[in-house]
Structure formats: C-alpha cells, structure tokens
Amino acid sequence: MTRIAILGGGLSGRLTALQLAEQGYQIALFDKGCRRGEHAAAYVAAAMLAPAAEAVEATPEVVRLGRQSIPLWRGIRCRLNTHTMMQENGSLIVWHGQDKPLSSEFVRHLKRGGVADDEIVRWRADEIAEREPQLGRRFSDGIYLPTEGQLDGRQILSALADALDELNVPCHWEHECVPEDLQAQYDWLIDCRGYGAKTAWNASAEHGSTLRGIRGEVARVYTPEITLNRPVRLLHPRYPLYIAPKENHVFVIGATQIESESQAPASVRSGLELLSALYAVHPAFGEADILEIATGLRPTLNHHNPEIRYSRKRRLIEINGLFRHGFMISPAVTAAAVRLAVALFDGKDAPERDEESGLAYIRRQD
C-alpha cells in the first residue's frame, strides 16, 4: 500500500486528503494549526462562489475553474455527514446613485471576462425590494448574477475534518513540518501548505513562478436586524466591499487586498473604512456586534493562477497559488491534483495537463 503524507491541513489539504482516502489510499495529514483551521487562509475567507463577479479581475483560467467547482461542491457536500450551508441564490451588485457610472464599467468588464448576457440581469428598485426587502428602498437598481452562490467556510473546514475522522485518516494537528521531515517515512508527499510553502516553492530555480502572500482583511458582524438572501457587492470608487450573509444572522464583510505580507492585526483606518462602507449599505448595520476583524495572507503566484507541480525524484506533488479564490476553485484544482497523484502512484506517465480541468501538470527537474 502506497503511504502518502499531506502537508497542510487547510482547505486544499483537507479536500485532497478526503478524495484520496475515499479511493482507499493510506493517508496521513500534517498541519501546524489546529483542527478548526484558524491558521488557514480559508478560515478568514467569505467562501463566495462567484466566478461571474470575479471575471472582472480574475484570469480566464480561474473563472473556468470556478465554474467547474460549483457542481463539484454539491457532490462534496453530499458526502459530508456534518451540516454545511450552501446557498445558490446568485449575488446582487448595488451602488449608490452618484456611483452609477461604475455599474456600466462593471458590466463591460463582466462581458470582457466572458460572462454571457443571460448571466447579467438588471433589477429595478421594485425587483430588489421583492427579493431583498431591506435594500429595495436604498438602491434604485442593481445587477443580479444568477449563477453564483456561497458556502460557510468554517463549517466546511469542520465538516471535512469530521469526514477525515470517519475515514480513519490520521490528522496530526499542531505538527509543523517540511517535506524533508517526512520523506523517509512516506512513499509520496503532497504539499498543500499555501503561503507556508513559500521558501520551498521559490527555491525551485528552474521554475518561473514565484509565490508571495497578499493580505486580506475581513470583518464578521452579528445583527438580527438585517436579513439578506444572497451575497451583496457594493460598487464604490474608493471602498468597494462584499457582504456575505451566513446562518444565524452572521455577516462576513471584506474588501481589502493589500500587497503586503504583514501578519499584523487590522489597522484602525482599514477597520473604519470597511465598517463605514458597511454602514452605508444599511444603517441598521451600525447596531451590529463586531465579532472579529481578521487578517490573512492569500498564497499568490505572479500570474495569479494556481499551479500543480510534481517531482518523481523527490516523490512530491505541490499545489499552490489559489490566491483569494480558494473556495471558488479548490474542488477543481484538488480533483486535478488527485488525478495526477493516482497516475504517479500507479507508476504511469503523467500527462502534460488534466483533461477535465485544463490545468497543466508542471514537472520539476530536481
């Protein structure tokens, strides 16, 4: 039996472990953090499944992977025994009256990103009021993107950990290690450490991509005074933001994307900007309880696409570069990595790319 160690127990590591364990492989998972996943980038994320909205800035490959991943998430959730939220009510884009020109620009970017006309639906104020009663009087029109959805990321992380326990996968939480620590004990290693693998990833001299962290700041608030039925994005020239409603009146709010690898707490200024923009969406948010303002580093490659690399000599597969799109694209990316892994475990030649996802398999020379 091939012995496999997965380094990194964030979202990608847990999904990879689940898929291999379901196929009967002998897996062990190692992570520097605890079972809840607080050290993972996914723990901070809003977990929106928004390939249409992200087409405004994301690469075509990321958008394609995002579209592939939504049905994959449905299948994954069916295999989890722990409750998880998955909402497929689309998303709503709104703006204040003075910022209406931003909506035309947004639509142009959507179409340039390959979003079809029937995926871009204009809602008037009465249509917003019917579907989002607490927003209808505040916004005269909006854009509805019907193909989008969201998860509760923290529920997913917990449910995946439960599933690994049910499959008797040894999970070594609070056990930080690097590939060299485990190579003598295991036949193959799969590195899913994200930003934690920066030194190892960038040490591969023959490979062109470089890994860095991009900082994000996300607030969580609680208020029973507001009900939203789908994620809402506010277009704004200075403070664009998204609001992702979770169960039990919790809302995840984010906006910032900072070219910094600082892991310091959020600043007063960035917190004020985020919460002021939230208050402008609806003043009832002014009475919300602030549960946390968290920061995280998203593992980002210079081309902003994910990559799957492998080395037969080192018996190592590496998955990285999911950037801020972890929940949106991880099912497609990890499924592609698992297909590569199975081929390598069986001693077969690796194809140049994965047929289903289109992702390239990059062979390291070391």
For each feature predicted by the language model, list its residue ranges.
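Dinucleotide-binding Rossmann-like beta1-alpha1 core, especially the glycine-rich loop
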Residues: 46-127, 131
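Glycine-rich FAD pyrophosphate-binding loop
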Residues: 22-42
